[in-house]
């Protein structure tokens, strides 16, 4: 149990939980759900963890989850808010979102800026 509490403290610190939970536009109950899912995953005793249909070594998943910060969490919560499609297995969806956030967030925002600057169907200058 001490291991879980140690990870909880580390994760809450990594994501700046206190500041994030008081931010306007942040649904605290959803934030708390994400935190618990991160802790459950990081504390898993499995050797492999399935994410988006692929098995990943638990150490790799743990490492990536421990690198999550407030920006990643805000990104995930914002994308969830924008989602209009039915999600059949929310746990699997959130695990994939958490795992992929550190490697997709910058590309998402770059594409969004490109769309805002040049509009749909407009080619960027070379």
Model-based region annotation:
Residues 1-126:
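Electrostatic interaction modules used in gene-expression and signaling proteins
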């Amino acid at each position: 149990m001490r291991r879980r509490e140690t990870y909880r403290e580390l994760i809450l610190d990594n994501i700046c939980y206190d500041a994030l939970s008081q931010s306007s536009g942040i649904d605290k109950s959803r934030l708390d759900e994400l935190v618990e899912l991160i802790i459950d995953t990081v504390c898993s005793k499995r050797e492999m963890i399935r994410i988006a249909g692929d098995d990943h070594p638990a150490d790799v998943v743990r490492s990536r989850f421990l690198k999550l910060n407030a920006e990643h969490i805000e990104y995930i919560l914002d994308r969830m808010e924008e989602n209009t499609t039915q999600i059949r297995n929310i746990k699997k969806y959130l695990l994939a979102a958490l795992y992929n956030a550190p490697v997709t967030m910058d590309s998402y925002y770059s594409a969004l800026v490109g769309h805002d600057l040049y509009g749909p169907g407009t080619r960027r200058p070379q």
